Amino acid sequence: MDPKLLDILVCPVTKTPLQLDKAQQELISTAANLAFPVRDGIPIMLEEEARTLTAEEKERFMKQKRG
């Protein structure tokens, strides 16, 4: 995914920044507790297409966010 695109995309639910999970090809919103799929390099930013993060996933991404 283009890093410039990631810089301007925000969560459609909370309007907060997203994190890219390269392994799962998802954009992560820890604020909304959602993972949005990236299909063929195209982010699918629809709430109904997103999946809910598990508690473990959310904690992992929160730690990554803090550095």
Swiss-Prot record:
Origin: domain of life: Bacteria
GO terms for cellular component: cytosol
Q: Which Gene3D superfamilies does the annotation name?
A: 2.20.25.10
Q: Which Pfam families match?
A: Trm112p
Signal peptide positions are none
Recorded hits in SUPFAM superfamilies, A to Z, give: Trm112p-like
Its protein name is UPF0434 protein Tcr_0959
Family per UniProt? Answer: Belongs to the UPF0434 family.
